């Protein structure tokens, strides 16, 4: 949920959501990088099921209050233990996360050098700040296109991949 279920002992996982029709979204024409609100809600639910010890918070470009408050964005990223986002969807804000946090970059295109570990800006930034980094790239045949210029993919497989990554770095 946008508000999440915040407690001091529950680590926060931020799920960055891009929309095709907000003033904050660049590349609004790139439907593979946009998720509908309905699909984003399904992703949150899948992540909550797989990661019950995390406070899963949707960080959306539709939240105009958050988008207008840079200090609020910095605080949100600083308090997150895990950030998951589409390539370019505000991932530069991982700069404000604590060292040793986890970053998952969703890479929608095969063989895109911007997303290759060590070759893309976010994997390099994660390395410099000592974040754990993982890239998720769903198979092309897994994508579904919606009428609203958005994409969907297998949310259960995605959440399982995230859980396995977090288990591998002792974040569960």
Placement of each model-derived feature along the sequence:
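The feature primarily captures lumenal catalytic ectodomains
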Residues: 1-172
């Amino acid at each position: 949920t946008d508000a999440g279920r915040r407690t001091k002992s529950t680590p926060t996982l931020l799920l960055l959501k891009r929309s095709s029709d907000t003033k904050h979204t660049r590349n609004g024409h790139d439907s593979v990088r946009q998720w509908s609100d309905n699909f984003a809600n399904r992703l949150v639910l899948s992540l909550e099921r797989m990661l019950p010890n995390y406070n899963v918070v949707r960080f959306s470009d539709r939240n105009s209050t958050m988008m207008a408050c840079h200090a609020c964005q910095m605080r949100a990223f600083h308090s997150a233990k895990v950030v998951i986002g589409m390539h370019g969807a505000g991932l530069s804000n991982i700069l404000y996360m604590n060292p040793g946090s986890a970053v998952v970059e969703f890479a929608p295109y095969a063989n895109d050098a911007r997303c290759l570990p060590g070759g893309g800006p976010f994997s390099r930034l994660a390395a410099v700040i000592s974040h754990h980094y993982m890239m998720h790239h769903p198979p092309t045949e897994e994508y579904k296109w919606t009428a609203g210029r958005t994409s969907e993919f297998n949310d259960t497989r995605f959440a399982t991949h995230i859980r396995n990554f977090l288990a591998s770095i002792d974040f569960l």
